[in-house]
Amino acid sequence: VTIDGEDARDFDDAVYCEPVKIGKEDCFRLIVAIADVSHYVRPNDALDVDALERSTSVYFPRRVIPMLPEKLSNGLCSLNPAVDRLTLVCDAVVSSKGEVSAYQFYPAVIHSAARLTYNEVADILGNTAGPEAARRPAIVPHLLNLYDVYHALQKARQLRGAIDFETTETYIVCNALGKIEKIIPRTRNDAHKVIEECMLAANVCAADLLIRHKHPGTYRIHASPTEEKLTQVRTFLKQVGLNLAGGDKPSAGDYAELMKQVKERPDAALLQTMLLRSMQQAVYSPDNIGHFGLAYEAYAHFTSPIRRYPDLLTHRAIKAILLGKKYEPKGIDLAGLNTTVSNATRKKQAKDKAQGTHKHEKDLTIWDALGVHCSANERRADEASRDVEAWLKCYFIKDKLGEEFTGVVSGVTTFGIFVQLDALYVEGLVHITELGTDFFQYDDARHELRGERTGKRYQLTDRVTVQVSRVDLEARKIDLVLAGGAAAQVSGAGLPKSSAAKALEAKPAKSRKPSANTASRYELDTNVDGGAPAKRSKGGSAAGKAPSRSAKPATKTSKKKR
């Protein structure tokens, strides 16, 4: 069966599970069947060239720009119910402890028994005697088997020490004219988690196969936190009486253990945000260094070839291995590939070069170029999605000028505080000139503004009441003022200047450090990234970001993104 969101149209994966006996041990046979896109999209044909150029599907609130033509993504390749479809299967044996003891890959034709949604499956798992279960009695035992293997895999995940940040994904609901009607949080239930763990297991098997056969590929790697980020987070934790274990090289388990310790604290959200910001971004690379956040020694993307080009490359590599051959991408115009790297990657490259540990140009392969290209296009797609969402949110809130809302401080900078509004899930800036007549010091370690005269503090996750004062659609910015202060002008001449203009004109808060580095935005890859390798969230990034603001708490993830 396939299990996806209500609005999904391209079905990459289908799952099946049954209990099996291996010797005296009770185990599970987990089958993850993935659409065989590589059968239809051949190297260097027109479809392949276009797919490589895009590298990923781009998800917007009301539409999707697919990596592949819809006749493939929603038709021939999509694992629709009651029709035969070509797949590449990962057939694995999972122990009761959640360990994959054996696996094999093979091409197969499947006939999906049903197209299920997360909510339908969650209802069945929550009540096997309920109306949803009564509608599909033949499927219930199979779903319970999947639920059992999920619990086993989840047990192994906890023992492994994988990090599981609790983040909120939002969903933008638009009317027929494309205008936002409401923004609502997307609930992540047990059905999401079942699929996530199944996809993670298949992705790990794919990476292991590449390693065992010494076949090159694009691994999904996630480096451990940098020395600079560790210093920042340890300084912050020390000030609140906490410590991150692990010394100079903490493990994912050290992070997970600390998160477990602070879970019940009133400042748990702030602490999670600071830990999240110490992370690096996951990227694609032929050089496997493991996945820090998921605590895997090797990890690759295999489960979403309809919407991610690296998964298609992994499929081609696996098929070559099955045939006893080697797949080497050829005929690719290197000059046409995206070579943009993130700031963090650029810093690491400079550091490696200074230490003489960098990869020399003569040693770079086509796989290196493809890893950089796919990583860059993934970031580009994310930025495009956020930009559209930001504009829509600005358009949504421009009718609410002068209205008051409660919210939480989601970012602190030298020029003000960013506030995410409750219920609306929209973010705006309260410029430092709107915080009162006090002179504010910016504490980089604590991520707070502190008034020198009054001692008033504004820190991440503080609750405030604000008023919408201005919306700049072109700049995608929302200006707020603290409620109870000077009345905001909301119409006619004399509208307050935009926060962007104020940020340029006003003297920013004095930083307590010579250089206050803004934290890089990090999206744990899962969900999901945490979640698993997931379809791009169609909502969640708030509008109103200033160019040089500190990163705000992550508000993402959906199905299987990691």
Residue ranges with predicted function:
Residues V1-G436, E505-K513, D529-A532, R536-G539, ...:
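Electropositive polyanion-binding surfaces
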Residues V100-Y106, L421, L460-P496:
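OB-fold/S1-family single-stranded nucleic acid-binding modules
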Residues I306, N517-S520:
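A subset of signal/propeptide-processing and intrinsically disordered low-complexity segments
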Residues K398-F405, F439-V466:
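Short nucleic-acid-contacting surface segments enriched for D/E, G, S/T with interspersed K/R
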Residues Y425-D444, Q489-L495:
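A short macromolecule-binding patch
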Residues L482-A516:
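Intrinsically disordered, low-complexity mixed-charge segments
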Residues L495, L504, R521-L524, V528:
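Hydrophobic/aromatic hotspots within intrinsically disordered, low-complexity regions
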